[in-house]
Regions:
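Mg2+/Mn2+-dependent nuclease catalytic core
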Residues: 5-112
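Acidic, carboxylate-rich catalytic segments that either coordinate divalent cations
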Residues: 112-119
Length: 119
């Protein structure tokens, strides 16, 4: 059973920010849920950037990614299989890998834009 502790919440990390759809706490895990509309939710492809986004939100909200961390993308079909939904879960190991990749993207974006908010 989960308890929702945040809806449409702005999260600010070290050099990045965004708005997540749901922050939840469960008995065995806690995490972030982000909804995505897509042409067909039943297609298996999930962009790596979606995992990185959830990892970034996790770090911004919780300060890190421990073994109880989890995240979900909920895909909602808008054209094919209209109204169908699919949930994709990311465990702590996947989120840690995604966070490592995201840190590189954050650094590259800051370099490209000469923007270092915490310098």
């Amino acid at each position: 059973q989960w308890k929702v502790v945040g809806l449409e919440q702005v999260l600010v990390g070290n050099g990045y920010a965004g708005k997540t759809d749901v922050i939840y706490i469960g008995q065995d895990e806690y995490g972030i849920i982000d909804f995505k509309t897509t042409k067909d939710a039943m297609k298996p492809f999930v962009p790596a950037s979606y995992k990185m986004q959830i990892a970034m939100y996790h770090v911004a909200e919780h300060g890190g990614i421990d073994d109880k961390a989890a995240g979900y993308n909920i895909f909602i079909s808008t054209e094919e299989n209209i109204g169908s939904c699919r949930a994709v879960r990311y465990d702590a190991e996947e989120l840690r890998k995604a966070w490592k990749a995201a840190q590189g993207l954050i650094a590259a974006w800051q370099y490209e834009n000469d923007y270092y908010p915490n310098a």
